[in-house]
Structure formats: C-alpha cells, structure tokens
Design a protein with these regions (language model features):
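Acidic/polar low-complexity segments and flexible, solvent-exposed patches
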Residues: 1-97
Length: 97
C-alpha cells in the first residue's frame, strides 16, 4: 500500500487532513520561542498555535488551513511583525463545519 493511500485512510478516519500551517520561528532556544509565542498571542489570538520540538529545534507553527491561498493570506498579514513566517504543508486539524 502506498504512503498516500495510507495517509488518505488515516485522514478519513480521524479529524485530520493534509493542509497548511505557518512556521513563525524555529530556534534551539525554547525561551526565545516562548517569547515569540507571547508576542504572537497579542496580535493573533484567533489562530491556533502549536509548539513542536523537532530535535534540536523548537518550532512555533500556527493555523489549520485547508488551502495554500488561505495560509498565504495570513502569512502576509503577519509579515510586518514576524518577517520569517512562511507556509508549510503538513497534517492539520479539520475545522468544524
């Protein structure tokens, strides 16, 4: 069975799907990521945030976007405060309809 077939099966049975998030920061310092997360909350409370440890880096990702266009729109809105923000594809939580 192919990887994509397995991925489709997992996403069908769960509340997950292939989508996009915005990577705000990836740093070796957890303290720096926490500081950026606090700054992010002040401006964008309505987006879900995900702090992920991907050795040796801690990453701050935001959003559960179904399309690249939607994620790009939000990334553009963040550029003035978070210049390094960019869109990444990954498994995201499906939004409730």
């Amino acid at each position: 069975r192919s990887y994509s077939a397995g991925l489709r099966e997992v996403t069908r049975r769960t509340n997950l799907s292939l989508g996009y998030r915005i990577l705000i920061i990836s740093d070796r310092s957890d303290a720096i990521v926490n500081q950026v997360m606090s700054e992010f909350y002040r401006s964008f409370r309505n987006l879900p945030t995900y702090k992920v440890f991907n050795s040796p880096y801690t990453e701050l990702k935001v959003g559960d976007f179904s399309t690249y266009l939607e994620a790009s729109y939000w990334a553009y809105q963040m550029k003035s405060d978070f210049r390094g923000a960019y869109v990444v594809q990954e498994i995201v939580n499906r939004r409730k309809k």
